[in-house]
UniProtKB/Swiss-Prot annotation:
UniProt key word Heme: yes
Record-annotated membrane-spanning stretches: 1-7, 31-52, 67-79
Record's GO cellular component terms: mitochondrial inner membrane
Residue positions binding heme b b562: H37
Name of the protein this chain belongs to: Cytochrome b
High-level lineage: Eukaryota, Metazoa, Chordata, Craniata, Vertebrata
Record keywords: Electron transport, Heme, Iron, Membrane, Metal-binding, Mitochondrion, Mitochondrion inner membrane, Respiratory chain, Transmembrane, Transmembrane helix, Transport, Ubiquinone
Gene Ontology BP terms: mitochondrial electron transport, ubiquinol to cytochrome c
Entry's cofactor comment: Binds 2 heme b groups non-covalently.
Main location: mitochondrion
Purpose: Component of the ubiquinol-cytochrome c reductase complex (complex III or cytochrome b-c1 complex) that is part of the mitochondrial respiratory chain. The b-c1 complex mediates electron transfer from ubiquinol to cytochrome c. Contributes to the generation of a proton gradient across the mitochondrial membrane that is then used for ATP synthesis.
Length: 79
């Protein structure tokens, strides 16, 4: 869904809101693509947090190298 959104989205600060409105109104099923993309991203981060919680529960933080690589990947994912 991100590829279809990227075809119509304009990152310019002046026209960004207009391009989102264009996606929702003028693109066939654009509102659905935007909705699926937003909910898919939310689900991705929920799964990410569950994975961190599982690592904390099972004591994976004691493996410092593995844990630090995971934290770096988390920060890079959010950046």
């Amino acid at each position: 869904s991100a590829l279809f959104l990227a075809m119509h989205y304009t990152p310019d600060t002046i026209t960004a809101f207009s391009s989102v409105t264009h996606i929702c109104r003028d693109v066939n099923y654009g509102w659905l693509i935007r909705y699926i993309h937003a909910n898919g991203a939310s689900l991705f981060f929920i799964c990410l947090y569950l994975h961190i919680g599982r690592g904390i529960y099972y004591g994976s933080y004691s493996y410092m190298e593995t844990w630090n690589i995971g934290i770096i990947l988390l920060i890079l994912t959010m950046a």
